[in-house]
Amino acid sequence: MTGTPGERFPHGRTFHHSQFPPERIAAERRHSVSVCLPARECAGTVGPIVRRLVELREAGVLDEVLVVDAASRDGTAERAAAAGAIVRQEAELLPQQGPVLGKGDALWRALSVLEGEIVCFLDADTENFSDHFATGLIGAICCEPDVDFAKAFYRRPGPSRAAVPGGAAVPGGAAVPGGAAVPAGAERPDEGLDPDGGGRVNRLMARPLVAELYPWLAWVHQPLAGEVAARRELLERLPFATGYGVEIAMLIDVWKESGTGRIVQVDLEVHRHPHQSLSALEPMARTVLATVARRLHEEGRLLEAPSGAPLERPPLASLALV
């Protein structure tokens, strides 16, 4: 196991996306870059996102834009293709592995066809997507020394507390908790939105869990953030949790492979996307807990294997792909 609690950068390295403008990445990068967007019923957002990514491709920031569609019925695949992305149906990737079992499985299968030496996973339902969602993560890998894995953090505005009887409105311009300095003029949450309202499972489950059980990773603001960039060779050595636990599993497994010193986080400021209902969050929280418990069991820190842990795909490098 590579990861150990006592190594350099014990509190991690944090960057702001503005440190990695497109022209810097185009000038400094030495590796091919692929961007992958897993998508399900995202017709309203996927087109504009892909167009921005295609512009970055033309500017020399990246080389490949792939959308992995989950049999969407709203025209997601068609809009992504029209905007310039390569589109593959998730069920067509590694079909010998059986049915696709969620987002993590889709990411694992996508890795089998992505060509870049650096892979960046982004959300296809981001409502306020801008270039910096890609450049911040790609730049951290391409422009900084000794970085294998870059994870996003951001504010996820939720419903305003002012809308709740007795709730107190939150003034705009709240600072990012523990984040890097935000340049003047940077985007702030819209008036009437609670800047801390989103990411409920992250705040109530994932962060306390990591702080208690993996305290050397407690500096990571959002263990459940789905936006990451990583070296392909690293991703190919990792197992992939198939369900909601993929993000926290990836963070822990990257630590085991590379150590905390090669993990960084990047402040992307504000991320807006559709929120799930409270009832939908319970199975998510259960899966996150079971995924962490599985790793504790594998490490010998939990005697019994957890029940309900999602199926995991083996490291892609362990498969004989034809």
Whereabouts are the PLM-identified features?
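Terminal low-complexity segments of carbohydrate-biosynthetic enzymes
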Residues: 1-12, 173, 179, 186-187, ...
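N-proximal low-complexity "stem/linker" segments adjacent to membrane-targeting elements
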Residues: 1-51
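Cell-envelope/extracellular polymer assembly enzymes that use nucleotide-activated donors
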Residues: 32-34, 64, 249, 254
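Short, acidic, metal-binding catalytic loop of nucleotide-sugar glycosyltransferases
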Residues: 51-62
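A conserved acidic beta->alpha catalytic loop
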Residues: 69-78
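Acceptor/aglycone-binding surface of glycosyltransferases and processive sugar-polymer synthases
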Residues: 95-103, 129-167, 182-234
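Short aromatic/hydrophobic "clamp" motif used to bind/position activated sugar donors
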Residues: 119
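Conserved catalytic loops of nucleotide-sugar-dependent glycosyltransferases that act on lipid-linked
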Residues: 164-165, 188, 195-291
